[in-house]
């Protein structure tokens, strides 16, 4: 379901009902008796035929769009069991951990399964995702959800990794990427040595809301031999592109002059009317009623109006000139968590590089060879001295 796309909606499929940008509801299709009720009306499942289609309600009061599920859209519509990892963070984490088709990934803290769907797609059918959850109820719900969504490369495990580690009986994990979403990740870091692939570079990311957690995790990573430690905080803003009507200075000046002229004309007419009413003795109520009718009639004419003020104009109308502009959100999305990254060098790499990722001196990398070379050099230096004697 999440690893491949299709056009036709079948019985038992998952459909995301898109109502608004902030209202997306998951629907498990039941063709015979299913009915999706919203404030826009009722939508029978039997009418759900194609992904991407627009479906009208039975009462003709509104419509929804039938969207194919993706990890990004599932993040916006899933039932929350815990705090989740949103796409802003998950996309960056996948890139930093270098998760790709065929990767073996460890995830500790399954929670609502938001990030699990993202890394399952990135690892592909050739990869494996070992997901650990210590809370039994959340583990059972997540396991059922993964089975319904056909995430066949996800292996969920019920375990407290902080105390019991990551080992799985009869399985050699050999992970190259690790994601820890735990209250105390520093207690789980020492257990990683047994389950990461030491023949290549392994990478870890700790997802921690509090800075104190980051400090303790950094200490644990350093003690366990991890290098290239870096903390990142992702702050995202949404940019919206649209068309805006062009307004020249000459048009603005002409518009202001026209408004001023019409104001002066209106004031002159009003003064003349008051003078006539005073001379003729017309009653005030009749005068007010006549003024209301006249203002209503004259309001339809706005004089010089180059930008269609007061009119309903469709964006991009060829009667006006437009330019493309981008507008940023006023507020940055609030802080979610700190992302702590680190790398574990392969065994060969540890012989070449130190903890600061600097190349070790040759004498440290090959102590035996360097000792033999030093002895040979000493003998070569002493030999001519004996000859001269």
Curated annotation (Swiss-Prot):
PROSITE patterns xrefs: SAM_TRM61
Gene3D superfamilies assigned: 3.10.330.20, Vaccinia Virus protein VP39
Gene Ontology molecular-function annotations: tRNA (adenine(58)-N1)-methyltransferase activity
Biological processes, Gene Ontology terms: tRNA methylation
EC nos: 2.1.1.220
Region named Disordered: 278-313, 364-389
Residue sites binding S-adenosyl-L-methionine per the record: 112-114, 133, 138, 160-161, 181
Record GO cellular component, one term: tRNA (m1A) methyltransferase complex
Keywords: Methyltransferase, Nucleus, S-adenosyl-L-methionine, Transferase, tRNA processing
Location(s) in or outside the cell: Nucleus
InterPro entries given in the database record: SAM-dependent_MTases_sf, TRM61_C, tRNA_MeTrfase_Gcd14
Biased composition (Low complexity): 368-389
Family classification: Belongs to the class I-like SAM-binding methyltransferase superfamily. TRM61 family.
Function (record text): Catalytic subunit of tRNA (adenine-N(1)-)-methyltransferase, which catalyzes the formation of N(1)-methyladenine at position 58 (m1A58) in initiator methionyl-tRNA.
Subunit structure, as described in the record: Heterotetramer; composed of two copies of TRM6 and two copies of TRM61.
The protein's name in its UniProt record: tRNA (adenine(58)-N(1))-methyltransferase catalytic subunit TRM61
Organismal lineage: Eukaryota, Fungi, Dikarya, Ascomycota, Saccharomycotina
Gene giving rise to this polypeptide: TRM61
């Amino acid at each position: 379901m999440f690893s491949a796309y299709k056009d036709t909606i079948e019985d038992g499929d998952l459909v995301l009902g898109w109502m608004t940008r902030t209202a997306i509801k998951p629907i498990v299709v039941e063709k015979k008796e299913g009915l999706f009720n919203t404030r826009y009306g009722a939508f029978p499942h039997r009418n759900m035929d194609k992904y991407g289609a627009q479906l009208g309600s039975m009462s003709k009061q509104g419509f929804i769009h039938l969207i194919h599920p993706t990890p990004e859209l599932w993040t916006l519509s899933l039932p929350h069991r815990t705090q989740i990892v949103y796409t802003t963070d998950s996309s960056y984490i996948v890139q930093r951990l270098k998760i790709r088709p065929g990767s073996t990934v460890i995830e500790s803290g399954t929670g609502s399964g938001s990030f699990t769907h993202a890394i399952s797609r990135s690892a592909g059918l050739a990869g494996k995702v070992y997901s650990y959850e210590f809370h039994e109820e959340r583990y059972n719900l997540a396991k059922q959800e993964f089975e319904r969504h056909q995430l066949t490369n996800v292996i969920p495990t019920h375990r407290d990794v902080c105390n019991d580690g990551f080992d799985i009986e009869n399985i050699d994990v050999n992970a190259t990427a690790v994601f820890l979403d735990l209250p105390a990740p520093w207690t789980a870091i020492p257990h990683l040595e047994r389950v990461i692939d030491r023949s290549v570079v392994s990478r870890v990311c700790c997802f921690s809301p509090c800075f104190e957690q980051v400090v303790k995790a950094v200490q644990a990573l350093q003690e366990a031999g991890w290098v290239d430690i870096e903390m990142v905080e992702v702050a995202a803003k949404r940019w919206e592109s649209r068309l805006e009507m062009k307004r020249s200075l000459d048009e603005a000046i002409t518009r202001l002059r026209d408004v001023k002229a019409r104001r002066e004309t209106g004031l002159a007419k009003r003064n003349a009317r008051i003078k006539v009413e005073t001379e003729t003795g017309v009653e005030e109520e009749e005068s007010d009623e006549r003024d209301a009718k006249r203002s209503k009639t004259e309001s339809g004419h706005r004089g010089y109006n180059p930008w269609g003020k007061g009119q309903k104009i469709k964006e991009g109308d060829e009667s006006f000139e437009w330019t493309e502009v981008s507008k940023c959100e006023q507020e940055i999305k609030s802080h979610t968590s700190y992302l702590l990254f680190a790398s574990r060098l392969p065994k060969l790499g540890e012989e070449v590089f130190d903890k600061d990722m600097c190349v070790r001196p040759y004498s440290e990398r090959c102590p035996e060879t360097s000792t033999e070379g030093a002895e040979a050099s000493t003998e070569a230096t002493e030999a001519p001295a004996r000859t001269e004697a």
